[in-house]
């Protein structure tokens, strides 16, 4: 699936231009360090509450709020008007777009979240790219190799390509999405699903269907 097929919604012009350079998801992952190439020091334009831990080169945009018990480790970028909740941890190599909500006790590791992404409490995201308006439910795990290794599904030498969610994709509560998974725009992975592979746009995947998919109209 092409990058242009996954991400087409409104986003910051500079980010839109940057994304259009890449034909494949693999190329996008390889180039992600370019986002932080010019980030050398802390640039705090938003509100960082007392008690928050900000380490290294971190940019926090205007109108953003970082809860007093959150942790952000640079290099990392947080866009404008974004909220980082209590006990959330943003680890080095992460890009959080504007108007995002990162809930209580979430972990974001070396991932790129575009604008208006909602990550609910307790979710874990590693080496992943989340499109505009996507939603990750409470307790969901994206690209968590530790879980997959415990099930014997990946090796220690697996690549650092995690999960890609297209614009407006949804991952339900307590679902686990395996590394290398691509979820098309407007596709829904229901609660408690163990998902892997490539899912075309406008699909619905539920636990009851045992990972079978069915077409879903764009208006439903």
Residue ranges of predicted features:
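Conserved mixed alpha/beta catalytic, RNA-binding, or beta-rich assembly cores of soluble enzyme
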Residues: 85-86, 91-92, 97-99, 103-105, ...
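Glycine-rich hexapeptide-repeat left-handed beta-helix
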Residues: 110-220
